[in-house]
């Protein structure tokens, strides 16, 4: 697991941050449309290549989260996008969850999906150059939420995902996001967030995930 720890440390070294460039095609279409640019594969690639080629990449960015489309593309210099990112000293990563869906017995809450076929996808992403991954769990706050069901289900999914990712030689970003929306107090947010994170780490330990080889977001 020392290699995973080295990857995590490289991503976060010298105060560098992680660039989230994993916007879906739909999100990129809205973003480019706002400046009257057609959302073609070529234009989406040009937008991202401009980001990844900037001088600030070398001093400010330790890791880049990519979208499935982008990790498979080549730059104008014929480098793959992961190669372009690596040449700046950053680590290429990939979003692997498939989105949040309604949680069966709690229709106001969400469960993040993407475990089906994850091992096979990770093998492909590793060959393409990815060395870390992202998975986001989403929790809402109100008088009755997040429910125990939501806390347990999302923590379990995050732990299973993390275990599979580490098996495949990559560092998992563990992202249990407690949404700020609502009329709750800051103290409520602190208490619920603490409960969520505690459960996540309980599940990570149960699934024998190496904590030195993860990044908590």
Question: What residue spans do the PLM features occupy?
Answer:
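Catalytic alpha/beta core domains of metabolic enzymes, predominantly
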Residues: 207-217
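Structured alpha-helical segments in the cores of large, soluble enzyme domains
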Residues: 118-132, 154-170, 196-207
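Conserved, mostly hydrophobic/aromatic
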Residues: 40, 135, 174, 216
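Conserved radical SAM core fold
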Residues: 99-103, 138-145, 179-183
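Amphipathic alpha-helical interface segments within eukaryotic helical scaffold
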Residues: 168-171, 176-178
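Proline-centered loop/turn at the N-terminus of a beta-strand
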Residues: 91, 171, 213-215
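Alpha/beta catalytic barrel-like cores
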Residues: 1-128, 141
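Alpha-helix N-cap and loop-to-helix initiation/capping positions
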Residues: 35-39, 110-117, 146-157, 184-196
